[in-house]
């Protein structure tokens, strides 16, 4: 059964909305990645902050206020007419909500704990529900008056990629007629300092797949799709998932789990490696991830595939990254937003790591060559791996 991504709302360091984000994506715009003090003591790493104006928060929804939900509401605003039409067509019980996140409410919880440490009491109006991982999905369902399946997924950096796979299963199994799916994550000090403690944060713009790579940049963002059976221009053809069970934070260096996920995605989509016209790499610019992903990509695509990491443009948006980068694949395949068939260019210093297989990294002149399928990879702590494949419909 085909599942179509029939509406897309998104915002990140590249901007807000499909048109603005597409312009920045295909220009390789890194201007949203700015050195930012205040997150990590005595450091100013580049951070991908959403600077677009966010909707005023409705007073009646004050108990649900968080930065995550603000970003989510902004993404919803872009596609709300299509969502309301789906609710009218199918009814609120037949619309599901599946969202991925990893920082849901952590910032609000940190602020509350800080007040409690000083005063012995939580601040007035503090809501424990703000820090639940299901909070974004719960807010969205309540806001829209939906009563279909509603849940959140949190598998670190594969969270929202898994949300898209889970949403597709809800359609295939007949539990829903439409699903709002995607991911959202916002910046928070606990997360940034946690990565800093792992010595994984770069002091400069991240440099994926370079011999000089030295760590990640963190960003925030939201991407929200309306997934339905009604035919549309872009389909979620399938996906694959695997688990390394290798290490709590490091990937299996052989790339075994990543290979399994990519091969499973190809099988589920009925495609061969040569059918993929663009691969969005996870490409965090850490020594371990990029080494593993280079090996895995070479195993699955021995003849090569045009590919790039978009992390230098947005930062690593963690639980939102899978959905956000699926959105980048969506924009790449959309002939209206990308009439020239541009591919997102790789932004790096151009110095390949001689210890790794050479990848066919894109540049400003790279174009789709007629193959209308794109794969997006997401790999996470704990060895969680997800690959998604999107396709442009004839």
Name each model feature, range by range.
Residues 1-5, 65-81, 87-92:
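N-terminal amphipathic, basic-rich helices that act as targeting or association modules
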Residues 7, 25, 97, 140, ...:
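Conserved small-residue
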Residues 13, 103, 156, 284-286, ...:
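Glycine-rich phosphate/pyrophosphate-binding beta-alpha loops
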Residues 16, 108-112, 190-194, 246-249, ...:
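Short acidic, glycine/serine/threonine-rich loops at helix termini
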């Amino acid at each position: 059964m085909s599942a179509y991504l029939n509406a897309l709302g998104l915002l990140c360091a590249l901007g807000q909305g499909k048109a603005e984000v597409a312009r920045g994506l295909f220009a390789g715009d890194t201007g949203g990645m700015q050195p930012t003090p205040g997150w990590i003591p005595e450091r100013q790493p580049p951070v991908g902050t959403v600077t677009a104006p966010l909707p005023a928060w409705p007073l009646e929804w004050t108990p649900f206020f968080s930065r995550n939900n603000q970003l989510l509401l902004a993404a919803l605003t872009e596609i709300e007419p299509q969502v309301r039409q789906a609710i009218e067509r199918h009814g609120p019980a037949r619309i599901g909500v599946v969202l991925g996140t990893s920082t849901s409410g952590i910032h609000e919880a940190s602020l509350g704990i800080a007040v409690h440490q000083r005063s012995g009491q939580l601040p007035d109006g503090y809501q424990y529900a703000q820090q639940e991982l299901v909070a974004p999905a719960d807010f969205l369902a309540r806001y829209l008056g939906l009563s279909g399946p509603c849940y959140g997924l949190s598998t670190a950096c594969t969270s929202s990629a898994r949300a898209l796979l889970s949403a597709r299963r809800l359609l295939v199994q007949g539990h829903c007629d439409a699903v709002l799916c995607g991911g959202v994550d916002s910046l928070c000090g606990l997360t940034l300092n946690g990565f800093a403690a792992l010595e994984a944060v770069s002091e400069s713009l991240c440099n994926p797949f370079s011999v000089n790579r030295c760590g990640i940049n963190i960003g925030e963002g939201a991407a929200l799709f309306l997934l339905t059976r009604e035919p549309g221009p872009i389909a979620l053809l399938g996906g694959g998932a695997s688990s390394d069970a290798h290490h709590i934070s490091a990937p299996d260096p052989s790339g075994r789990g990543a290979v399994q996920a990519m091969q499973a995605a190809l099988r589920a989509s009925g495609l061969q490696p040569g059918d993929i016209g663009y691969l969005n790499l996870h490409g965090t610019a850490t020594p371990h991830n990029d080494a593993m992903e280079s090996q895995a990509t070479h195993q699955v695509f021995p003849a090569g595939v045009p590919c790039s990491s978009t992390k230098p443009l947005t930062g690593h948006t963690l639980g939102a990254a899978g959905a956000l980068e699926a959105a980048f694949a969506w924009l790449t395949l959309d002939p209206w937003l990308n009439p020239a068939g541009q591919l997102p260019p790789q932004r790096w210093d151009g110095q390949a790591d001689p210890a790794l297989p050479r990848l066919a990294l894109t540049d400003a002149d790279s174009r789709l060559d007629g193959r209308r399928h794109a794969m997006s990879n997401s790999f996470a702590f704990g060895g969680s791996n997800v690959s998604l494949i999107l396709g442009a419909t004839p």
